[in-house]
């Protein structure tokens, strides 16, 4: 029979609708609710087989295209590799309800069976992965290294795969056998009261295999402690707080499981001259009031290969004005573009003047015209009106 018909859903059903339909039927035909009922057991296996296919996006796509006997269905098609025994059907059942057992409650079974899942120590979902642990290291870069990119060698402590046994944990290939209790699945299904549950196999600790002749070097773990040098290529444009992920450079997994990842966290030292704002650089440039009045061309520092660039400061520039030098900022870490260099001009008032300098400034002040100081004139006009309002 068609899997969609078995679950009572349309071919356009969403994954959530398929799961909901399966849950309802699986509870209805569960053998613990129908003891000794052969037809209920058959239907339970049937709906479990249908969900095993339709609940998996890849299997469902193959089934929709080719039917039960499609090229990706395995030997004998989907049905031939389906729920031939009750243990497989119960495992599918546990997978569909896994996230709702025990724990902090509120799930489907807690409402249906009064929290029996927690009472029996049920675990949600599949067993945790035995992949090696991920590692993290911090690296400090100079401002220039972050701007240009750099290669670094890091010394990382952790676990590596045991060379003596190639990570298997056994002296020889014959030193490993399939667990007799769980038949290699890593889980055992037990019937407790009203329903059945899957739990980690106690004989193999969920590995699915038992090492009878452990490696003398790693003592059956498949890995050993190690310190190694890791070459890291840090791209230009990184900033503090960013991290680089190096897949497979973490701890080796136990008994041949995949290695974890290495995360390199970046810290960038501050620069004495530049501030960074995204990909833009900000440079505070102090100039004298004469240069501000007359205008000037100045050599200013940059992070580019040339080291400097010439900046034209227009006459009459005011303190706080920002001049933009395009393309002289930080490179974007995700592409080929660069930010800009933003030069914030700070006009400095002279201090500790000599008598001669003071006399020259007084002579200049005597020649001032209103148009020389438009802001000053505007301000005086405003306060003149302000005081006239309070005149008696």
Swiss-Prot record:
InterPro entries assigned to the protein according to its UniProt record, in alphabetical order: DnaJ, DnaJ_C, DnaJ_domain, DnaJ_domain_CS, HSP40/DnaJ_pept-bd, HSP_DnaJ_Cys-rich_dom, HSP_DnaJ_Cys-rich_dom_sf, J_dom_sf
Annotated CXXCXGXG motif repeat ranges: 162-169, 179-186, 201-208, 215-222
Molecular function, one GO term: unfolded protein binding
Cofactor: Zn(2+)
Main location: cytoplasm
Keyword annotations of the record: Chaperone, Cytoplasm, DNA replication, Metal-binding, Repeat, Stress response, Zinc, Zinc-finger
Positions contributing to Zn(2+) 1 binding: 162, 165, 215, 218
Ranges annotated as CR-type zinc finger: 149-227
GO cellular component: cytoplasm
Record's keyword annotation contains Chaperone: yes
Keyword Chaperone: yes
Superkingdom field: Bacteria
Record: residues binding Zn(2+) 2: 179, 182, 201, 204
Subcellular location: Cytoplasm
Cofactor note: Binds 2 Zn(2+) ions per monomer.
Domain spans labelled J: 2-67
GO biological process: chaperone cofactor-dependent protein refolding; DNA replication; protein refolding; response to heat
HAMAP family referenced in this protein's UniProt entry, alphabetically: DnaJ
Binding partners and assembly: Homodimer.
Function: Participates actively in the response to hyperosmotic and heat shock by preventing the aggregation of stress-denatured proteins and by disaggregating proteins, also in an autonomous, DnaK-independent fashion. Unfolded proteins bind initially to DnaJ; upon interaction with the DnaJ-bound protein, DnaK hydrolyzes its bound ATP, resulting in the formation of a stable complex. GrpE releases ADP from DnaK; ATP binding to DnaK triggers the release of the substrate protein, thus completing the reaction cycle.
Similarity section: Belongs to the DnaJ family.
Domain notes per entry: The J domain is necessary and sufficient to stimulate DnaK ATPase activity. Zinc center 1 plays an important role in the autonomous, DnaK-independent chaperone activity of DnaJ. Zinc center 2 is essential for interaction with DnaK and for DnaJ activity.
Name under which the protein is recorded: Chaperone protein DnaJ
Organism in which the protein naturally occurs: Chlamydia trachomatis serovar D (strain ATCC VR-885 / DSM 19411 / UW-3/Cx)
């Amino acid at each position: 029979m068609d899997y969609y018909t078995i679950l009572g859903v349309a071919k356009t059903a969403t994954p959530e609708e398929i799961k909901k339909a399966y849950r309802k039927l699986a509870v209805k035909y569960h053998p613990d609710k129908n003891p000794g009922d052969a037809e209920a057991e058959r239907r339970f296996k049937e709906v479990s087989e249908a969900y095993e296919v339709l609940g998996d996006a890849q299997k469902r796509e193959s089934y929709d295209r080719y039917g039960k006997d499609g090229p990706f269905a395995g030997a004998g098609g989907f049905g031939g590799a389906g729920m031939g025994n009750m243990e497989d059907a119960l495992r599918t059942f546990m997978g569909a309800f896994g996230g709702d057992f025990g724990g902090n409650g509120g799930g489907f079974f807690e409402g249906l069976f009064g929290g029996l899942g927690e009472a029996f120590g049920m675990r949600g979902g599949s067993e945790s992965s035995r992949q090696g642990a991920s590692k993290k290291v911090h690296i400090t870069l100079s401002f220039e290294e972050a701007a240009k990119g750099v290669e670094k060698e890091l010394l990382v402590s952790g676990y590596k795969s045991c060379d003596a046994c190639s990570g298997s944990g056994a002296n020889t290939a014959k030193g490993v056998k399939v667990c007799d209790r769980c038949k290699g699945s890593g889980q055992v299904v037990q019937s407790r009261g009203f329903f059945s549950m899957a739990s980690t196999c106690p004989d193999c600790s969920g590995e699915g295999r038992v090492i009878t002749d452990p490696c003398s070097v790693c003592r059956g773990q498949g890995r050993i402690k190690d310190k190694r040098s890791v070459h890291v290529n840090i791209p230009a444009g990184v900033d503090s707080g960013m991290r680089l992920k190096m897949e497979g450079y973490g701890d080796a997994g136990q008994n041949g499981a995949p290695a974890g990842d290495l995360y390199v966290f970046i810290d960038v030292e501050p620069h004495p001259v530049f501030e960074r704002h995204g990909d833009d650089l900000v440079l505070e440039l102090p100039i004298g009031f004469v240069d501000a009045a007359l205008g000037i061309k100045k050599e200013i520092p940059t992070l580019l290969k040339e080291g400097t660039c010439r900046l034209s400061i227009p006459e009459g520039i005011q303190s706080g004005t920002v001049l933009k030098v395009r393309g002289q900022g930080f490179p974007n870490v995700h592409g080929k573009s660069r930010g800009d260099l933003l030069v914030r001009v700070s006009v400095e008032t002279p201090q500790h003047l000599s008598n001669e300098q003071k006399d020259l400034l007084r002579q200049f002040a005597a020649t001032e015209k209103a148009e020389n100081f438009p802001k000053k004139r505007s301000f005086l006009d405003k306060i003149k009106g302000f005081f006239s309002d309070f005149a008696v």
